[in-house]
């Protein structure tokens, strides 16, 4: 990374290197039942990455295929655990299970705003899931998972700018079969699963899968006598396969998932975890204007009830939750799909019709500390919901005696997205806000956290009035502190955002066989996207409107202290545009866009075992709306050079609705690759470069979520994009260029010297970096100051080096039919920054995660007993670190040091899962 050298522990690197010397992801089984025999006899791997059943070695694109056996051995129950066997993939979840994010080659959708679509599209049985996090459910019985890297779109479904994860479940079988599985582990983990399949008639077969999971939480909340980040979920999927003729089949799938869980806890980042924290988590002693050591916000939080031990947790998983606050949430996810395949003789027709309904509500102690600053109450009226209908048609065949393998298709989707939010200020917010202002500057001598306005009675108000010039201005400021102190348990009653997305596309993907060894692939896609948006706000924060009414004139006071305090009081009283001025107000907008994307590939097979290829792809991800009222306007805005704070002064909320829009993301991708495959050994390599324009970035700056479409400027702006000004660093529109480049090398290999022994390995080196000069949109507007660390640095959650390795050994034990199982996998990751604003306090050192499984299996694997461990060495690390909401002290010496680009901001982190272990019993009939 630009800010720190790679420091992955040497022993971790050596561990992975030893496995790499032996062995990438275990590769997929057959794409359809009729290919299984061929795979068993030849070792060939069949995928449908190009819309046709092809040998993996014949596919001229970068794709990893993970088999059901490998998924079972690695303990993968959802797509997060694919990280262990796919080095270019990173899947993580943060503030909510619904907000999971997938990244490929360092690129993914950043942040948890549902208005942003996924850079990495997730499909389950050909049906698009609206956001990556929706794919974090239990998967049931899986045939294989394909991970395609690079822009997608010419093969069908929804387009994606970074890649695709395609999950294929096991189909119904016309031979009877059943299996059961029971697992018990630490944290009182219990997982029960099973499936049954078989014929219902000569032409009709069925399958039912079911999973039930429960587990205690990884965090403890002693204040509320509970645990957090637990599991309590179930999943059921039923299928019917009807084959009335050899040429026609219908596959009907219905599934339902329910989750009733508490998620997601976070703890403070301290200087034992990240050296750049320094003294940020120490109280200021004494509490004085310069505060040579420590941080005044620590004094405030401590004095209002946060135990001082909570600021130095290391990796301790004890939460300090506000009394009565809860992380409880409920999620339901269900849908139905129908896949029709019809062999017309000269062509094959495929139709996939799907309907999905996903709804998730989550409470939270949104400040992640004991002091009650922000919260969301678990409620049936607060949720995010996706209702999606999709229809895909593909027609594929051959022409000119097999010279042309053609595919044409169409896709249509209609999606309703509803977000209802009830974020409110906590019962201690008013005192917290006033103390935050009083404690950090020249007025620190008035600090009195047990008194109204956080000032010493009598003396405090008088001193405030005198310090701000006396007269009416002084009275306004003194009264403003008293008024802000009353801002408790106010905010959103219900804010409702609604977005309808209508997307249709035409696509074609054609393979031209120039010679027996040379192919040219040409693909094209036209996409038309229309989005309609409306929102209605409910808010009871009358303190904001009262502060605006009494203090707006003081924003232009000749007294500098009065101006600063008036701005601080209004800003804290109206954080995130939480104001009764919006109560009952509705806004609406719409946008339309269309885009032509495509791919061109040349592949050459000099020998039967070797293929080389070169490709170019143009990718696209739709623009949309920031579903967050905080983006409508800044707390203090200028009108004709005069500061103001109300919506009315700016023409009302509807006049500002354009501030919520963001542009589509575009990518130009280039790739050179080679694939070598024999029965015993396979190796694939790819060199790639991807240039992203309008890179959609969602960042929480400690106060609000902001969305910018990051671009580069071909003219050096003299580091004006790295200062604290929102007005410097503009670029002429004609000089705007791509803002993000991802380039690197991927290697995947597998060695199978014996049917009972397999070793696999993968390596991804990726340099995913922002340009040196950045702007905030395609017109060249300045980059937001909150993003001033981005220019020239690596993207968040984009480690430069990742290696994966696995060893599988299933030896026969004598002649009784018994066999053993030994499986181990490892993933080593170099340093990376987990925060989208790239503050050094969010950096994560490199680490290695090892999973292992040993077992005994009966004849024909009719039964098995397995012992397993995930994260065997109990490695602690952060998935994402973030600015602790509203918890920033006053900037003063020595925090002007570059080590503290966030001033006195505190930071919190979502930890990854600790070591888990247990026993699994399997039975198959």
How would you name each of these model-derived features?
Residues 423-424, 430, 756, 827-835, ...:
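C-terminal beta-signal and adjacent terminal beta-strands/loops
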Residues 100, 117-119, 131, 140-149, ...:
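Outer-membrane beta-barrel translocator/receptor signature
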Residues 241-243, 409-413, 499-690:
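Structural signature of Gram-negative outer-membrane beta-barrels, strongest in the C-terminal barrel
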Residues 40-175, 672:
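Acidic, small-polar-rich N-terminal luminal/periplasmic segments of exported/outer-membrane proteins
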Residues 33, 403, 409, 516-520, ...:
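Gram-negative outer-membrane beta-barrel transporters
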Residues 225, 231-406, 413-417, 456-457, ...:
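Outer-membrane beta-barrel domain signature, strongest for Gram-negative TonB-dependent receptors
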Residues 1-74, 79-85, 197, 246-247, ...:
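N-terminal Sec signal peptide and the immediately downstream disordered periplasmic leader
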Residues 218-227, 264-321, 365-380, 422-494, ...:
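Solvent-exposed loop segments that connect transmembrane elements
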């Amino acid at each position: 990374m630009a800010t720190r050298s790679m420091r992955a522990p040497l022993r971790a690197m050596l561990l992975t290197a030893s496995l790499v010397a032996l062995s990438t992801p275990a590769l997929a089984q057959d794409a359809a039942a009729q290919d299984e025999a061929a795979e068993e006899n030849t070792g060939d791997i069949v995928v449908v990455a190009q819309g046709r059943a092809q040998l993996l070695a014949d596919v001229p694109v970068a794709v990893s295929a993970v088999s059901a056996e490998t998924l079972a051995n690695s303990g993968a129950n959802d797509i997060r655990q694919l990280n262990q066997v796919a080095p270019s993939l990173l899947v993580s979840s943060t503030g909510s299970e619904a907000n999971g994010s997938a990244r490929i080659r360092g690129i993914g959708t950043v942040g948890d705003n549902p208005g942003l679509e996924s850079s990495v599209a997730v499909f389950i049985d050909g049906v698009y899931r609206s956001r990556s996090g929706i794919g974090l459910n239990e998967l049931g019985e899986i045939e294989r998972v394909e991970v395609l890297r690079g822009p997608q779109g010419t093969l069908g479904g929804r387009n994606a700018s970074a890649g695709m994860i395609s999950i294929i479940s096991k189909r119904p079988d016309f031979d009877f079969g059943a299996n059961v599985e029971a697992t018990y582990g630490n944290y009182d983990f219990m997982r029960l699963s099973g499936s049954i399949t078989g014929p219902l008639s000569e032409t009709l077969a069925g399958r039912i899968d079911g999973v039930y999971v429960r587990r205690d939480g990884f965090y403890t909340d002693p204040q509320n006598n509970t645990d957090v980040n637990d599991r309590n979920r179930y999943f059921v999927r039923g299928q019917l396969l009807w084959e009335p003729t050899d040429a026609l089949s219908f596959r009907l799938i219905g599934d339902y998932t329910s989750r009733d869980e508490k998620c997601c806890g976070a703890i403070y980042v301290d200087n034992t975890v990240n050296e750049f924290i320094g003294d940020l988590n120490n109280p200021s002693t004494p509490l004085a204007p310069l505060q040579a050591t420590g941080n005044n916000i620590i004094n405030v939080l401590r004095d209002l009830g946060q135990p001082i031990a909570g600021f130095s947790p290391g990796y301790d998983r004890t939460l300090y939750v506000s009394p009565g606050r809860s992380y409880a949430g409920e999620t339901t996810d269900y849908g139905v799909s129908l896949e029709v395949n019809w062999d017309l003789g000269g062509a094959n027709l495929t139709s996939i019709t799907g309907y999905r309904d996903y709804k998730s509500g989550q409470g939270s102690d949104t400040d992640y500390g004991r002091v009650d600053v922000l919260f969301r109450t678990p409620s049936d009226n607060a949720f995010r919901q996706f209702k999606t209908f999709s229809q895909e048609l593909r027609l594929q065949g051959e022409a000119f005696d097999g010279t042309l393998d053609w595919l044409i298709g169409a896709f249509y989707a209609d999606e309703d997205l509803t977000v209802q939010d009830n974020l409110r200020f906590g019962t201690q917010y008013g005192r917290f806000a006033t103390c935050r202002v009083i404690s950090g500057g020249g007025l620190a001598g008035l600090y009195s956290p047990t008194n109204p306005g956080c000032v010493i009675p009598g003396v405090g108000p008088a001193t405030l009035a005198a310090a701000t010039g006396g007269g009416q201005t002084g009275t306004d400021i003194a009264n403003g502190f008293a008024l802000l102190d009353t801002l408790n348990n106010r905010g959103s009653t219900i804010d409702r955002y609604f977005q309808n997305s209508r997307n249709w596309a035409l696509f074609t993907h054609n393979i031209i066989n120039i010679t027996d060894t040379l192919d040219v692939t040409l693909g094209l896609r036209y996409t038309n996207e229309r989005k309609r948006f409306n929102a209605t706000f409910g808010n009871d924060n009358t303190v904001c409107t009262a502060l605006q009414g009494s203090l707006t004139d003081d924003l232009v006071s000749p007294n500098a202290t009065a101006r600063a305090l008036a701005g601080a009081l209004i800003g804290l009283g109206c954080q995130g545009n939480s104001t009764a001025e919006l109560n009952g107000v509705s806004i609406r907008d719409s946008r339309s866009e269309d885009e032509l994307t495509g791919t061109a590939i040349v592949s050459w097979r000099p020998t039967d075992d070797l293929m080389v290829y070169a490709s170019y792809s143009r990718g696209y991800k739709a623009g949309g709306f920031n579903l967050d009222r905080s983006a409508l306007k800044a707390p203090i805005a200028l009108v004709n050079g005069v500061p103001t704070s109300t919506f009315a002064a700016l023409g009302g909320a509807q006049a500002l609705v354009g501030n919520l829009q963001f542009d589509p993301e575009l990518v130009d991708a280039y790739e050179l690759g080679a694939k070598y495959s024999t029965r015993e050994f396979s190796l694939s390599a790819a060199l790639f470069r991807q240039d992203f324009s309008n890179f959609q970035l969602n960042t929480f700056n400690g106060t609000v979520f902001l969305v910018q479409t990051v671009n580069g400027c071909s003219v050096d702006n003299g580091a004006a994009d790295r200062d604290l000004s929102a007005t410097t660093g503009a670029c002429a529109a004609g000089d705007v260029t791509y803002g993000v480049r991802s380039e690197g090398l991927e290697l995947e290999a597998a060695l199978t010297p014996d049917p009972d022994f397999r070793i696999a390995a993968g390596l991804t080196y990726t340099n995913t970096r922002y340009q040196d000069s950045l702007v905030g949109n395609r017109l060249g507007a300045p980059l937001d100051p909150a993003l001033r660390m981005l220019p020239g640095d690596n993207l968040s959650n984009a480690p430069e080096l990742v290696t994966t390795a696995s060893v599988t050994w299933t030896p026969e034990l004598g002649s009784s039919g018994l066999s053993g199982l030994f499986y181990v996998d490892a993933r080593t990751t170099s340093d990376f920054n987990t925060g989208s604003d790239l503050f050094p306090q969010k950096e994560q050192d490199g680490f290695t995660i090892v999973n292992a499984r040993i077992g005994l299996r009966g004849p024909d694997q009719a039964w098995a007993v397995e012992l397993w461990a995930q994260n065997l060495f109990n490695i602690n690390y952060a998935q994402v670190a973030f600015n602790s909401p509203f918890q920033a002290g006053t900037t003063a010496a020595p925090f002007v040091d570059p080590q503290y680009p966030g001033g006195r901001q505190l930071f919190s982190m979502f930890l990854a899962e600790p070591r888990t272990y247990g026993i699994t019993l399997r039975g198959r009939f």
